[in-house]
């Protein structure tokens, strides 16, 4: 039995770790998301997430509720309708940077390398991607809660747009 167990453990250790998914509140829903003690609308509200909130690791789910990591060892539940599942990527472009292209493209029109550039992210920059909004090879980027860009006055600038998948690699 021990002889069989060791190779299985070794094989499992060699498998790549699955990248984590995270929750980010939908700022256009009602501006916030309640995190509850249990997966129902009658349970105690532990905290409220808003547009300034950073992403929270998704630990699991129960129906349409997501169990997320709060600070320390605390966890809570948030309804999936209150936000987005995001995945972390790193800009890793042969060109040294990746362009974030304009998100507002006419319905039915493809995003192309000729679409308006909103900003350019240097290699090594963490990029939050919302998979449900991807369009083919173009991944939907948001800096909500991370605010990696600043405006000319030094204030946080909210940017959303598309980055070609060839310019990114999955992180976490």
Please place each PLM-identified region on the residue numbering.
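Sec-dependent N-terminal signal peptides
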Residues: 4-13
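Beta-loop motif signature
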Residues: 28-64, 93-135
């Amino acid at each position: 039995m021990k002889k069989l167990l060791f190779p299985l453990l070794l094989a499992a250790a060699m498998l790549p770790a699955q990248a984590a998914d995270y929750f980010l509140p939908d700022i256009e829903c009602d501006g916030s998301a309640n995190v509850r003690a249990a997966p129902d609308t009658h349970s105690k509200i532990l905290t409220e997430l808003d547009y300034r909130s950073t992403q929270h690791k998704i630990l699991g789910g129960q129906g349409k509720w997501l169990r997320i990591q709060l600070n320390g060892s605390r966890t809570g539940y948030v309804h999936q309708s209150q936000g987005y599942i995001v995945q972390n990527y790193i800009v890793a472009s042969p060109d040294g940077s990746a362009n974030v292209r304009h998100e507002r493209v006419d319905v039915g029109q493809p995003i192309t390398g000729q679409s308006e550039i909103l900003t350019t992210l240097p290699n090594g920059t963490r990029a939050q991607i919302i998979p449900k909004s991807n369009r083919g090879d173009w991944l939907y980027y948001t800096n909500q809660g991370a605010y990696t860009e600043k405006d000319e006055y030094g204030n946080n600038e909210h940017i959303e747009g598309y980055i070609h998948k060839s310019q990114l690699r999955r992180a976490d």
